[in-house]
Amino acid sequence: PLLFPLIGRLQDSQYTLDGRAWSISTHGFARDAQFQVSEQGPTALSFQLEDSEETRRVYPFSFVLTVTYTLTKAHRVENRSAVPMLYELGGHDGFRTPLEPGETMADYAVTISGVEELRPYGMDSRCMLTIGEARFPLEGGRIPLSPRAFGLDTIVLDLEGERRAALVDRSGRERVVVECPDFPYLGLWTADKPFDTGYFCIEPWSALPDAVFVG
């Protein structure tokens, strides 16, 4: 799914705009919306989502969101409102894990290029970001896919340098690579109950979710 116009949760599922409180669900509405095919070619496919009466009940802007899939993926957000439009955009792309018969998710880990020490944002039991960052002990430069590492929902990171993440197997071979030069944050997620779900999400984000210290 695609996260738009919100990434993560808001306190009380509300935001305030021009003195009015608006209610919107976790990750916004794009993940549940019906996109329309806008362009189709032999090697690419584009989908569009436009504002509607339903979206304007929770997000008072006129917009067009276009997503193009090839071997790469591109996003374009067009503001059709007469005022500046606030929005966030994030991926929620899941990749089959493990990739080979006989493997489990424990045979895989995530590496972040150019980062020697990971300091993910803290998160409370409601999956809201907390003040400051927590230090994450790396095992050989990797984040292991384990219930211990992902026991509290999502690992949220600042991306620096190459802004490149890879899913690697026990031999260190990169099996999935996600490059996101235009996204400053990264979310790493999989379901924790049960943990061995067969997929893992590497999610480029344009912004951070709401935090408990936001008043």
For each predicted feature, which ranges?
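Acidic-aromatic substrate-binding/catalytic surfaces of carbohydrate-active enzymes
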Residues: P1-A21
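Active-site/ligand-binding surface loops and adjacent short beta/alpha elements
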Residues: P84-L86, G94-P181
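Short, intrinsically disordered, charge-balanced linker/junction segments flanking boundaries
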Residues: T68-T72, A211-G215
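Hydrophobic small-molecule pocket/channel-lining residues, especially in calycin-type beta-barrels
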Residues: I7, A30, Q40, E53-S62, ...
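Generic recognition of long tandem-repeat/solenoid scaffolds
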Residues: A44-E50, K73, A165-D169, I202
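Extended, loop-rich substrate-binding clefts of extracytoplasmic carbohydrate-active enzymes
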Residues: D18-L71
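Acidic/His-leaning functional-site neighborhoods
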Residues: W22, H27, D32-E39, L138-V214
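Asparagine-centered strand-capping/turn motif at beta-strand->loop junctions
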Residues: K73-S81
